[in-house]
Amino acid sequence: MNTRIIPALLGALLFSGVAEAAPSIYPVDTARFLGGSRFDFKVEFDGELAEKDAKVLINGQDAKAVLDAKPEFIAKEKGADASALLLRGASLKPGQYKVTVESPTGKASANWDVYGTPDKPVAKNVILLIADGLSMGHRTSARLMSKGVTNGMYNGKLSMDTLPYTAMLGTCSVDSIAADSANTASAYMTGHKSSVNALGVYADRTPDSLDDPKQETIAELLRRTTGKSIGVVSDAEIEDATPASVVGHTRRRADKAEIVDMFYSVKPDVIIGGGSAYFLPQNVPGSKRKDNKNYVEMFQKEGYALATSNTELSKAVKGNPDKLLGLFHTGNMDGVLDRKFLKKGTVSKFPDQPDLTDSMRAALSVLSKNPEGFFLMLEAGLVDKYSHPLDWERAVYDTIMFDKVVAMAQEFCDKNPDTLLIVTGDHTHSISVIGTVDDNLPGELMRDKVGIYAEAGYPAYKDRNGDGYPDDVNVSKRLAVFIGNYPDYYETYRPKMDGPFVPSVKDEKGHYIANAAYKDVPGAQLRIGNLPRTESTGVHSIDDLVVGARGPHADAFRGFMNSTEVFRIMSEALALGNK
């Protein structure tokens, strides 16, 4: 080769690899959202410029005029050393829109599909039931443990198995193929995709987690355009990602004190869950607030009946309240395996926590009083909380509990056929049933006691009292369930009878290593993790979700769908478009 042309070739290659700086547009390209819903429009330029040099058009017209919102031009955005254009509270009529941005620092474009809804609603009520992290492995394990199998045939179905319409949901994020509960639940509540850890916003470049471009949630939309009641129920902290998605706007899901203020702003008629530590002023023992606001008292002054135990919840419901605040734990509540059977976790400290079925019953009692209807989001949050630390038995017992809530919802739908019921998770875990573990099989290693294929046979769970739960989780022949991603940990092949599983602990280098507390469990096997050593538990998988539905417009769930379609179907059923 002629060496004299090498510099020229290198120069050409380097030049071709340099991308032109491009502004960022929010809502993002490919966004599909509801006509008439509110959103913040933002353009982030890649350098400082004068407002007159920024050309922002929507379908060839000035964006400020099209969006009918007050613009704010930021000459130098904090932390960016670049300019931005921001319009808060914009809305659009249904149609196809193309946004084009040109400036001395670069150009960009985005296409939006803004959809409408029918003029008249087909549903009066919407019940959205979410088991956080619900995966096929949870469902299969719950059916095996709760119903059993005879000669290859299940002895019964889960209630969620009987929903007539099903689809697969994709949960990818704006910034990643992976997702967390914040932005997956937010997709259901806003119809917009978002970024990992974000709630009701497009994550922008500013350091402030609370100033990002907002997406109106279904609760805000209902408050603004209807007289319907709103309910939010969880057995996790009520400020946690999934329940927070009903009202929240933050780039950082950990802004839990601020999320309580967002609950207070929207004021759902029913708020039930854990997380009282963020409602109480900082001078109260156990509070996690950094101010003196007492949101318990503030909600009570707004007419909310208060319950802090299951006994108080029953009493409050008998009082026929119009609004209900139930806070039963300073943090996440305990799952059914600990509450009902083992009495571990924090049950001794919080002995009178309601079951999720109790919370569902209370919520329906209050919400169904409204002749204009209601929207209820209920989360079984601990399915995820236990799946992360590989504590699959606790996760599956809570899946069985969740299915009891589904059965209650179906009974409500039987009596109220104008109710759309949607049942799903918000993301998945890589959990699978691969056979059984039989303590009576020979072998020194527990792995040799794992039965696969024909050797699996059937587990020995019994449900003599007919409550749907195995009477004993620690039977001699039990399910072999494994999760496909994990930190270093000791696999014991047994349920954790002494309390929730803590698979790993941090060493002096800041890496997570297997928790030696399980090292001497007979037959325990050290498993070297397949995740980065910064991870203490398993993580979410990117597998598709299953969604089931019944009621008005449930037939819209079919095939594969993006998770944002859940919002669209709810909006269509309630005719919320362009109000």
Language-model segments: residues:
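Gram-negative bacterial Sec-dependent N-terminal signal peptides
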Residues: M1-E20
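Short, aromatic- and glycine-rich surface loops/edge beta-strands on solvent-exposed regions
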Residues: P94-P104
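Edge beta-strands of extracellular beta-sandwich domains
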Residues: K107-G116
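A post-motif C-terminal structural segment
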Residues: L134-R139, R143-S186, D240-N578
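Active-site nucleophile/metal-coordination loop of metallo-enzymes that catalyze phosphate/sulfate
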Residues: P23-S24, E48-K52, L67-D68, I74-K76, ...
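Aromatic/hydrophobic beta-strand junction motif of beta-rich domains
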Residues: F39-G47
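Aromatic sugar-binding surface patches on proteins
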Residues: P71-L86
